[in-house]
Structure formats: structure tokens, C-alpha cells
Swiss-Prot record:
Region (Disordered): 307-326
Reaction(s) catalysed (UniProt annotation): L-methionyl-tRNA(fMet) + (6R)-10-formyltetrahydrofolate = N-formyl-L-methionyl-tRNA(fMet) + (6S)-5,6,7,8-tetrahydrofolate + H(+)
Organism classification: Bacteria, Bacillati, Bacillota, Clostridia, Eubacteriales
Annotated residues for binding of (6S)-5,6,7,8-tetrahydrofolate: S110, L111, L112, P113
The protein's name in its UniProt record: Methionyl-tRNA formyltransferase
Membrane-spanning parts: none
Source organism, top-level taxon: Bacteria
Function: Attaches a formyl group to the free amino group of methionyl-tRNA(fMet). The formyl group appears to play a dual role in the initiator identity of N-formylmethionyl-tRNA by promoting its recognition by IF2 and preventing the misappropriation of this tRNA by the elongation apparatus.
Keyword line: Protein biosynthesis, Transferase
Keyword Transferase in annotation: yes
Family membership noted in the UniProt record: Belongs to the Fmt family.
Enzyme Commission (EC) number: 2.1.2.9
Annotated GO MF terms: methionyl-tRNA formyltransferase activity
Length: 326
């Protein structure tokens, strides 16, 4: 079996590492991002990939810059046949891509060339895509520009959240990776150049992406809310401060002339309706700042909103990176 050098950081990558190990592939080394401070205490937290590697007694490398010649030389000494890269978090130099004689294979959570870049899962939902998928790709020095090896398509349901799609794509991606490694080992792995048409970029999520702008159409806000569930969440500002909205539905606006961001109805046993730039959102689950998530009806019962309450965009929130985020 091929000897694998694995590079990855978050849980999405850990799923692929587990799959390789369960399939019996010898993983000669694991490269992941350095431990990062997390939580209020700032305690260093290992990446999910590091946790899997340590649990299996694998050598772990955490260079701050993989481009350094001495790091590349150290990894070459492991004697890997193929490098597998899944959400590692650093751009790889040509020297790093050539550590293994058979090259480097990447697992990317989109149907390339659509959604090249750092946040393809959330960007696909935010754009209202009804289909995405996973590609395995022969890596080159560009950002997700290499030849595609294998592809698997995955539908995006109208209620699918970012977390649900992440988990499904991680599972599908791990299966596709195993098939890709088998094809590489057999010598018949495809190399399909990406088309020049249809290229889009999935920019890294920034704090501004979390802000709910009620002047936008309700459909766009709905996609934003579900794309950012369960992390990092979408925010607005109300009379009681910042409010995170976790679940909502697009509904007709019962008060078409209302200013966007205005509560226009309280809906018994369901929540409250907020006017948007086009249509309205029936808010079903919220989280006041510093409190636990709750259904919107409980928030209404506690006096959180009433008809006429105004929400406005908050300043872009500061947040901690997700576990394993590069």
C-alpha cells in the first residue's frame, strides 16, 4: 500500500485521516497547524487532526512555515509515496508539493472550478446553490487550480445548514479520497484540467459576514443564517443588545411598507416576523448575547421584542477562530 504523508487541520480533515487509517494505509507523518489559544483562558488547543494523529501514535509536525527548506527536507526523510492535503491552512510551495514522488492530492469541498478558496461550504449556501460536492485534485502552486481527479456531487436542501453540509461533505470527501488513492496506486487516476469558465472564489469568512443587513432580501438573509449555523452565527442588534439568529423562515411581509429590521408580527407558538428589504423573516430560534440558545417564542414571552421593535446591523463582531481553523 502507498505510504501517505497527511496534511490537514480541522475536523473536516480529521474525517479523511481516520478513513485512511481505517483502510490500513500507512501514514508516515502528519503535518498540521500549530496549537492555538482557545476559550477565555487562552489555553492552547490542538487541532482535530493532531488529536487523531496522537491517538494513533503517528509522528506530528507543526511548522509555522512549511515553505522553509529545512522543514521540506525533514518531511522528505519520512519516505512517503503520496501526500494528501485536506484543509491544511497554508499555501504549499512547489518544493513542498514534490515531497512525495507521486505528488500531492487535495480534497476540496466544492465542484471545482466553482468556489475555489477557503470557505466553499458556507459560500455555496450563502449563494443559494442547490448543489455542491467534493473534488479530489492534483495540486499545483495555484489556489485550487490543479487538475481534477475524481468528483462526487451532493445536493443542498432548502433547509440545509452549514454544519449539516460540512458533515456530509466530510464523509463523502473521505470516501472519494480512498477511491482516489486506490486509483493513484493502480496508476489510472484521471487528470482533468479545470475549465476556464465558471470560476468563483470562496473568500475566507470575515466578521462582517456575520452581520445581518435587514435591507437585503429575506431569501439572502435566510441563506446567510443557515450557512453560518452552527459557526460562527449571524447577528443583529436590538433593544437588548446583540442577538444571534439561528433559525428562521422566509415569509410574505404582512406590512410591506415597514422599514427593514422592524418587527411586524408576533406569531403564536412560532416566533416573530421581521421586515426585510424584500419579504420578511419569521425568526424561530435566537441567542441573546451571553445566554443560551432559545426558541423565539420564549424570547417573545420574556419581553425581548414586540411589534414595532427595531433591529439594526451591529458592528462587525470579534470572534475566536473555530477549532482547527487556519
Amino acid at each position: 500500500m502507498l505510504k501517505i504523508l497527511f496534511m490537514g487541520t480541522p475536523e473536516f480533515a480529521a474525517v479523511s485521516l481516520r478513513a485512511l487509517l481505517e483502510a490500513g494505509y500507512p501514514v508516515v507523518g502528519v503535518v498540521t497547524q500549530p496549537d492555538k489559544p482557545a476559550g477565555r483562558g487562552g489555553k492552547l488547543r490542538p487541532s482535530p487532526v493532531k488529536e487523531v494523529a496522537l491517538a494513533h501514535g503517528l509522528p506530528v509536525f507543526q511548522p509555522r512555515r512549511l515553505r522553509r527548506p529545512e522543514v521540506v527536507a525533514q518531511l522528505k526523510e519520512l519516505g512517503s509515496d503520496l501526500t494528501v492535503v485536506v484543509a491544511y491552512g497554508q499555501i504549499l510551495s512547489r518544493e513542498a508539493l514534490e515531497i512525495s514522488p507521486l505528488g500531492s492530492i487535495n480534497v476540496h469541498a466544492s465542484l471545482l472550478p466553482r468556489w475555489r478558496g477557503a470557505a466553499p461550504i458556507q459560500r455555496a449556501i450563502m449563494a443559494g446553490d442547490v448543489e455542491t460536492g467534493v473534488c479530489t485534485m492534483w495540486m499545483d502552486e495555484g489556489m485550487d487550480t490543479g487538475d481534477v481527479c475524481l468528483t462526487a456531487r451532493v445536493p443542498i436542501g432548502p433547509d440545509t445548514t452549514g454544519g449539516e453540509l460540512h458533515d456530509e461533505l466530510a464523509r463523502v470527501g473521505a470516501e472519494l479520497l480512498l477511491e482516489t488513492v486506490r486509483r493513484v496506486e493502480a496508476g489510472d487516476a484521471p487528470r482533468i484540467p479545470q475549465p476556464a469558465e465558471g470560476v468563483t472564489y470562496a473568500a475566507k469568512l470575515e466578521p462582517a459576514d456575520e452581520v445581518i443587513d435587514w435591507a437585503r432580501p429575506a431569501e439572502e438573509l435566510y441563506n446567510q443564517i443557515r450557512a453560518l449555523n452552527p459557526w460562527p452565527g449571524a447577528y443583529t442588534n436590538g433593544p437588548r443588545g446583540r442577538l444571534k439568529i439561528w433559525r428562521a423562515s422566509v415569509v410574505p411581509n404582512p406590512e410591506p411598507g415597514a422599514e427593514p429590521g422592524t418587527v411586524v408580527a408576533l406569531v403564536r407558538r412560532e416566533g416573530f416576523t421581521v421586515a426585510a428589504g424584500d419579504g420578511a423573516l419569521l425568526v424561530r430560534e435566537v441567542q441573546p448575547h451571553g445566554k443560551a440558545r432559545m426558541d423565539a417564542q420564549s424570547f417573545v414571552n420574556g419581553g425581548g421584542v414586540q411589534v414595532g421593535t427595531r433591529f439594526s446591523p451591529p458592528e462587525a463582531p470579534q470572534r475566536e477562530p473555530a477549532p482547527g481553523e487556519a
